[in-house]
Swiss-Prot record:
Protein name: Proline-rich receptor-like protein kinase PERK1
Record region (Disordered): 1-137, 169-251, 605-652
Species of provenance: Arabidopsis thaliana
Phosphoserine PTM positions: 408, 437
Residues holding ATP: 286-294, 308
């Protein structure tokens, strides 16, 4: 090989160039190069260097596949000791220079162990090896970095999934709602639960690489990738519910199995309600009426409820049942009876209400042998029920018209707070239609004149009925007196002249309940009298809104505001002949006489003399004192219907 002499000539220039490379690339080789700089002066060793140089070329290819040797390079770098030149020389130093000369690989292995060569190769070719070592180290570092990142991602996902699984288990075990066990089951094993568990197992099997685990501890600090848990939204949905709609119901966090009709109340099976009411036994019967029965029940959780069971052949049926459920699902107010759940099983339709334990206004005001109700209690009940109706009319969207306001539909708790009940006859009136013509359903004695005659339905019809309730609280009388069948005056017509005198002269004699004596606040009495007079006006458009009634009863508004639109000096607005009306007065009187004779002339009265069954409920309870011959009737299309075993409301 003639090439041997040429290297002999070149060695002198080569030494300066390599040092520059070595210094630029890696500091460790540079440290080893200074001592050998003195050796290049001797040419004889150079041939040996040539012989040695080709052999290392063979280590080049073998050194590439195993990444382990580079690991050995890193430890020697920190060691400044003279032993360092020995370690770098064997594998890596010759990597860049030898790729061009592959023919000498065979001789490489035997020559590498030679101990004489280490000096010269380190001097002549340390710089190129440094470059190659850089290439190897960077590739390895990149690979390690990528592997570490992948491991981090997998491990964080596994940790998040494990936490999520634990949380889900805890939530499922913490579910406290007892009544509908079947619905709660689907939650735990529902679409969200099953998919999540499968997903967790799938991801858990993913991290099978063993070497990856070694880098696990360092990556843990970068736990910020918490954002990858978008899958958890399903459990959040389960916890909420509610919402629905009782956004009510934010207070009620129980599960929302009953989304069938679009609200977050609870569904019950017929068997559950049958067990709760002891088979709908007579002992648990709270009342009955034209549309069905009301039974008291106790849920497995111990909560008392009132179960309203609709009669199969009643006018309410499926259509009105679904309308009622849809309406009540949007209502939540302290002065309105709350719906707890419902049941639809075949032809069976049941509603589950909260149980209000202290009966109703009719029982406490007109019940036989009941103590006289104090004035402060009467005012409290009037104000509470007015707030409940105001909520229905003005705070619900669309507004809700009750259509059957009466004393037996105002339930009383032990604190004598009023709760308006029975939305079975309620209807929704959209803002686009100012009135809705429907079947006439209401209780005789409370019907607004325009409603009883034509079926025109507005929220002002409820205002009229509430005015009748106020007159009951003021006078202690019933809406209709069945004992005087041929007397034309109802409670409203009898009270009109007295309301006129009381509003002008402040004289409540003959109007206020004589059983109270004079134990009432005259200013509060004046406010209630003014409200009652305004509510029972013939003209529906001249009746105030329920929110105005609330403010007037609270004393937060002038009583003159109740007379908006009335001509000054026309005090006869309270009389039967005041001003122009939307409903002809003579026609009103004729209709009332006709309705009254139909109601009282077709009913037979018992003589038991005791107040029948204590409670009324949700508009379905038969209440009445037979000795006084009460006669309240459910009306439909002007036809009076008997309700059997009593009468579905107050009368007389």
């Amino acid at each position: 090989m003639s090439t041997a002499p040429s290297p002999g000539t070149t060695p002198s220039p080569s030494p300066p160039s390599p040092p520059t490379n070595s210094t630029t690339t890696t500091p460790p080789p540079a440290a080893s190069s200074p001592p050998p700089t003195t050796t290049p002066s001797s040419p004889p060793p150079s041939p040996s260097t040539n012989s040695t140089s080709p052999p290392p070329s063979s280590p080049l290819p073998p050194s590439l596949p195993p990444p382990s040797p580079p690991g050995s390079l890193t430890p020697p770098l920190p060691q400044p000791s003279p032993s360092a030149p020995i370690t770098p020389s064997p594998p890596s130093p010759t990597t860049p220079s030898n790729p061009r000369s592959p023919p000498s690989p065979n001789q490489g292995p035997p020559n590498t162990p030679s101990g004489s060569t280490p000096r010269t190769p380190s001097n002549t070719k340390p710089s190129p090896p440094s470059d190659s070592s850089d290439g190897l180290s960077t590739g390895v570092v990149v690979g390690i970095a990528i592997g570490g990142v992948a491991i981090l991602v997998i491990l964080t996902l596994i940790c998040l999934l494990c936490k999520k699984k634990r949380r889900r288990r805890h939530d499922d075990e913490a579910a406290y709602y007892v009544p509908p066990p079947p619905p709660s089951g689907p939650k735990a094993g529902g679409p969200y639960g099953g998919q999540q568990q499968y997903w967790q197992q799938q991801n858990a099997s993913r991290p099978s690489d063993n070497h990856v685990v070694t880098s696990l501890p360092p990556p843990k600090p970068p736990s910020p990738p918490r954002k990858p848990p978008p899958p958890p939204p399903p459990p959040a949905f389960m916890s909420s519910s509610g919402g629905s709609d009782y956004s009510d119901l934010p207070v009620l966090p129980p599960p929302s199995p009953g989304l069938v009709l679009g609200f977050s109340k609870s569904t019950f099976t017929y068997e559950e309600l049958s067990r709760a009411t002891n088979g709908f036994s007579e002992a648990n019967l709270l009342g009955q009426g034209g549309f069905g029965y009301v039974h008291k029940g106790i849920l497995p959780s111990g909560k008392e409820v009132a179960v309203k069971q609709l009669k199969a052949g009643s006018g309410q049926g499926e259509r009105e049942f679904q309308a009622e459920v849809e309406i009540i699902s949007r209502v939540h107010h302290r002065h309105l009876v709350s719906l707890i759940g419902y049941c639809m099983a075949g032809v069976q339709r049941l509603l589950v209400y909260e149980f209000v334990p202290n009966n109703n206004l009719e029982f406490h005001l007109h019940g036989k042998g009941r103590p006289t109700m104090e004035w402060s209690t009467r005012l409290k009940i009037a104000l509470g029920s007015a707030k409940g109706l105001s909520y229905l009319h003005e705070d619900c969207n669309p507004k809700i018209i009750h259509r059957d306001i009466k004393a037996s539909n105002i339930l009383i708790d032990f604190k004598f707070e009023a709760k308006v009940a029975d939305f079975g006859l309620a209807k929704i009136a959209s803002d686009t239609n100012t009135h809705v013509s429907t079947r006439v359903m209401g209780t005789f004695g409370y019907l607004a004149p325009e409603y009883a005659a034509s079926g025109k339905l507005t929220e002002k019809s409820d205002v009229f009925s509430f005015g009748v309730v106020l007159l009951e609280l003021i006078t202690g009388r019933r809406p209709v007196d069945a004992n005087n069948v041929y007397v034309d005056d109802s409670l409203v017509d009898w009270a009109r002249p007295l309301l006129n005198r009381a509003s002008e002269e402040g004289d409540f004699e003959g109007l206020a309940d004589s059983k109270m004596g004079n134990e009432y606040d005259r200013e509060e009495m004046a406010r209630m009298v003014a409200c009652a007079a305004a509510c029972v006006r013939h003209s529906a458009r001249r009746r105030p809104r329920m929110s105005q009634i609330v403010r007037a009863l609270e004393g937060n508004v002038s009583l003159s505001d109740l007379n908006e639109g009335m001509r000054p000096g026309h005090s006869n607005v309270y009389s039967s002949y005041g001003g122009s009306t939307d409903y002809d007065t003579s026609q009103y009187n004729d209709d009332m006489i006709k309705f009254r004779k139909m109601a009282l002339g077709t009913q037979e009265y018992g003589t038991t003399g005791e107040y029948s069954n204590p409670t009324s409920d949700y508009g379905l309870y038969p209440s009445g004192s037979s000795s006084e011959g009460q006669a309240t009737r459910e009306m439909e299309m002007g036809k009076i219907k008997k309700t059997g075993q009593g009468y579905s409301g107050p009368s007389l």
